[in-house]
Amino acid sequence: MLLSQNVSAIGPLNLYPMVHISLVFGISYVAPVLSDEHCTLKMRFRNFQSVLSWELKNHSIVPTHYTLWYTIMSKREDMKVVKDCINVTRSFCDLTDVWVNTTDMYIPQVVGFRENAKLVICMGSFFLVPDKPLDPPEFEIVGFTNHISVNVKFQFDSPGILSEELQFYLAFIEEHAGNSVKRHQPQITGNITKNFNYVIDKLIPNTNYCISVYFEPKDPRKINRSPLKCTLFRPRRESESSESATIGGIITLFLITAVFISTVMILKRIGYICLRNDFPKVLNFYKLSVWVFAELPPLEKVATVEVIHVNRKKKVWNYNYDDENDIENEAAPHLISGGYTKHGLTGKLCPTSTTSPSLEDCSLEDCSEPSAEEPYLPEPKGDAETPMAPGPGLWQSEGTSGGYQTRGTLWQDPTSEEDSDSTEGSEGRIVFNVNLNSVCVRALEDDKDSEVTLMSPSCPEETVELEDLNETESSVLVASEEGTQLPFTNPSTECPRPQDAPSDKSDTSDPDVDMGDGYIVRQVNLKKFN
């Protein structure tokens, strides 16, 4: 609730704290009418302008136009017409520039006409200093966070009059807040011609303040206050917003710091950062472009690995052809399923392929070229015909007893050519599986020059020539209990298997033939191991 209070005393000692501000220029004053009672004359100041107005008491008389005359009582002069108020239709006249002396008494005369006839004459007298009330000036208020600014606007049409009159008036600003009223008195001089600002501080937060501005005349009854203008003072709203913004900034900064520290710890734990120098190169991310643009992995390096086969020397028994030594040293054959007997044969073998580089290491005493030395022998006839084995035999061997010898040929794998390249004194160890059902044994003649033709199931055209006992003694195959597997030749060098070879002869032929000297001559067909 806004309250207003009139100021009865004039002076700086009569300032009382008030919350409402009121600045009043004065109250309108109606001058007494000295003429007849046909009119009522009024003198007012509107925005520091002296305006004389009149009103007819008899409303039945309606003049069409008016003319204003005036004179000064102290000068005893005739009536003067006001140039701006001749034959005017309005009921007021501006005398700001005409009545300039505030110490003289002016006597105005208003004449009303209807066409050329006078209808009414009104007269009066006015003393400007006591009788001229001042209207309140225009003002604006602006609320800030810690104060309120009051901007008072003076509109002076006649600065000369104000310079003489305002020095007799005091300007007040009343401040209303609730039931309390506080009056402020700004310092105003008589030569004020411009606007001025007044600051009201030390305000209570969240309080509604209303301001009024007025001029206080000598007569307290003539105070004319301006309408109130109010504003709500809320300084804490901005402070609360600033505090909330500060708290929000602190929380945001804390969250960003926590996320950053957590990310760094996670990256360090999984090994993407803070890597040790001795880690593999695949874990070192020195180039950021590698992370963004993935590059193709480098090609794998191919290194040549040399595989060296070590041929260990096996113990070779001193084999002789005596009956006793042969019986003692002869290894008992190992029987396996399928009707096969496993014999351990020890000796130096040479491949039959002419393209194998291991032929260079074989001496002429131990092996001979089948294509160069062995003549083609015709197939035996009658009972001495050698049957062909049904299995895929890759070996050819010849068994001897007493004064006869057996020479075998071996197909080697080209990958083992380097291993077979050894000196003449090195010997290997070979293990064969022999199918006794496919072995053809025949009796050899006593003549040393006789020949035995051995037919291999895989190569029926290949023949073996008997050689002298003295020249082939070193290549005799000795039976042994242990053996090693020989490398095999390339399948491209093997002879094709004949499909039309009869298999019934091997079943009817006698596998063992007694030579009469205690030895049994066998024709052995060796099989390739996979």
Swiss-Prot record:
- Its transmembrane ranges are 247-267
- The record's disulfide annotation reads 39-122, 85-93, 210-230
Q: Which InterPro entries does this one have?
A: FN3_dom, FN3_sf, Ig-like_fold, Interferon/interleukin_rcp_dom, Type-II_Cytokine-TF_Rcpt
Main location per the UniProt record:
membrane
Q: Which Pfam families match?
A: Interfer-bind (PF09294), Tissue_fac (PF01108)
Q: Which GO terms describe its molecular function?
A: type I interferon receptor activity
Q: Tell me what this protein is called.
A: Interferon alpha/beta receptor 2
Supply the source organism for this entry. Bos taurus (Bovine)
Task: Name the lineage.
Answer: Eukaryota, Metazoa, Chordata, Craniata, Vertebrata
